[in-house]
Amino acid sequence: MSPKTETKASVGFKAGVKDYRLTYYTPEYQTKDTDILAAFRVTPQPGVPPEEAGAAVAAESSTGTWTTVWTDGLTSLDRYKGRCYDIEPVPGEENQFIAYVAYPLDLFEEGSVTNMFTSIVGNVFGFKALRALRLEDLRVPPAYSKTFQGPPHGIQVERDKLNKYGRPLLGCTIKPKLGLSAKNYGRAVYECLRGGLDFTKDDENVNSQPFMRWRDRFCFCAEAIYKAQAETGEIKGHYLNATAGTCEEMIKRAVFARELGVPIVMHDYLTGGFTANTSLAHYCRDNGLLLHIHRAMHAVIDRQRNHGMHFRVLAKALRMSGGDHIHAGTVVGKLEGERDVTLGFVDLLRDDFIERDRSRGIYFTQDWVSMPGVLPVASGGIHVWHMPALTEIFGDDSVLQFGGGTLGHPWGNAPGAVANRVALEACVQARNEGRDLAREGNEVIREASKWSPELAAACEVWKEIKFEFEAMDVL
């Protein structure tokens, strides 16, 4: 080729590598109401300036790549690129920053949590220029959230279906989590529901194993539900875990649950995946089933303070993908959950409009418009002595779930359920009378145990049980 010959590459295109901040760090940018906003905790490698690190996150999670490419000229990068528009240091940390990134809405497929996460928490988390990266929060604009169905039914519809108002709902995970036959499993379900619980639950590990195939479990649990309903006059439910190896099998199990006439099914939304979860949520709305969500695997993603994704983001994603309940920690039990942080994402699950509040870890104001809310489920290492704190912390719109705290009662499953129901009713009554559960909770339980031998026995068994470990994820 003659030296004088001009090519496309030599006109308006300069090959090579340039700093991300030249294109993707735009502190002058005014965010739009339609932008998806993200707050990342960024720990750069030594020698990488904060602006370059923040810009790299914006680039690698949107339109950028490691080198300049001539096909940039075939589109409008200004329209589609992510922008790092602000950076602030993390107090008390030497080389850590919060980078705020704005993404134009056109980058994301409507109604797809899967596509949204593929971009925002995709390959950028393995980027070598960063020692660690954590997505702390996400602002989902109404223009995007309205493309999602959200929860199949929501809090008010669930209460109307169950005809239960003015108190938290009570549940129990059947134990041992693995190894029971379907008939013995159904027996435990019946005893707990007859004793006063609203729900019992499949453990997240229970799918369709050799010792208990899913169809047998579904049938025996349905029998237990109907028998308990007939004896108590209350509507009962059992979270039948429909999680399976394929979406087709999952839907088949949900169809069978609907044919049995039970009110609720369950899904492990992180191990099952967002695409499967959204499909199941759509089926549940169309067919009148409530959907309980377990968060198995969440701690792999959210427990480390410097890397991964905070659970408040996973909670928002679940509200969009669809679920009527989700496990949300207990604050007082055996599982991770600091109070202010937990209440922050509990509000993000339940409320329509949540103001920015950094004291609770909420980086952005979130407007869900008319999307139904999700009931937070407190579960894991809780018992009757925790009831006042749980009632005070979570309020009425919650599910309090006692597995070992029901089935571990010295007199059996039904007395364990009675003890929990009595404790809950006593706490709700005391609260409604104006008593301070935070200060008087133990006294409320002691008073109730004087006329409930089941509660008295439970109080004696668990009087010394505490889980006093420092939370890993704090503000």
Swiss-Prot record:
InterPro entries hit by this protein: RuBisCO, RuBisCo_large_chain_AS, RuBisCO_lsu_C, RuBisCO_lsu_C_sf, RuBisCO_lsu_fd_N, RuBisCO_lsu_N_sf, RuBisCO_lsuI
Propeptide section residues: 1-2
EC number: 4.1.1.39
Cofactor dependence: Mg(2+)
Family label: Belongs to the RuBisCO large chain family. Type I subfamily.
HAMAP family, per database record: RuBisCO_L_type1
Protein name according to UniProt: Ribulose bisphosphate carboxylase large chain
